[in-house]
Swiss-Prot record:
The keyword Lyase does not apply. GO terms for cellular component: cytosol. Binds 2 magnesium ions per monomer. This is Anthranilate phosphoribosyltransferase. Homodimer. The lineage of its organism: Bacteria, Pseudomonadati, Pseudomonadota, Gammaproteobacteria, Aeromonadales. Belongs to the anthranilate phosphoribosyltransferase family. It catalyses: N-(5-phospho-beta-D-ribosyl)anthranilate + diphosphate = 5-phospho-alpha-D-ribose 1-diphosphate + anthranilate.
Amino acid sequence: MTVSLEGLYRGESLTSEQTEQLFGELLRGEMDPIVLSSLLTAMKVKGESPSEIEGAARALIAAAKPFPRPDYEFCDIVGTGGDGLYTINISSTAAIVGATCGIKVAKHGNRSVSSKTGSSDLLEKLGIKLDMSPETARHCLDEANICFLFAPHYHSGMRFAAPVRQALKTRTIFNVLGPLINPARPTYQLMGVYSPDLLEPIAETLHALGLKKGMVAYGSGLDEIAVHGETQVAEINDGHIRYYTLTPTDFGLKYYPLESIQGGTPDENRKITETLLAGKGTDAQQAAIAINLAPLLKMGGLVDTLKQGAEMAIETLRSGDALDKVTQLATLSHKE
């Protein structure tokens, strides 16, 4: 191993370069599992720094299967997971509605780790081929405004960390890396985090990784923008990071109790999503999708305000057109 961990054991942070080197070794299968275990634990106890998160993310992006990146603007909407609140699939549903509105979304996701249904679990239930090739995914993004990048398909080196992660049974740096390592490298992004302590380090990391426009959100216990309370936000805009609070009122929406957006099993969540996309969801469910899609519609230039974004999202949901978008994506995803 080329980088000494002595400083880390003393509570000092690694540099971005040191972390990138270490994670490069891990992804090539060159790191002893005991060393990896102590690396992850020492980082967790100290608290992962922005430089460490950035270095690890750079190593994962560099080692990922390449994606034919387009030259147009496109986004991702994703959460860290780990909030333990088992809501409906907000980000996946919002991605589909966003594509129907006219923004382009390259959704990077995985199977569920801590919730009942991850984005992959849901999209698979909707008939979308998870392991489509990068070229097919790019074609979907071009033609349908949306594609799905299944994390294990692009980040095969992560398999070397899996046994240690399972044995540790605790959150580590990997829990926050997933949303940062989309191999398509979106130009703008909404990312939800499971703790307010992550707002600043994640915003700084996204900025360091070159994201021009983005929002990191923690919504009263949720890794989404909340319909049931306040949302703390870190907004990235051309090199500046601004911290503030949002409420449903800022979107022209009412407050709804958290129980009104509860999810369930993969089958139950698929039914809820299909009902929503067909224009028949509850007001609370529609509000949860709209409040999380509105910032992306604004960043993507389709609207000028968050209220206009929420209105566009709800109008699109109620039209039922988003269900056709799922059919289009499912069909294109199977064409190799």
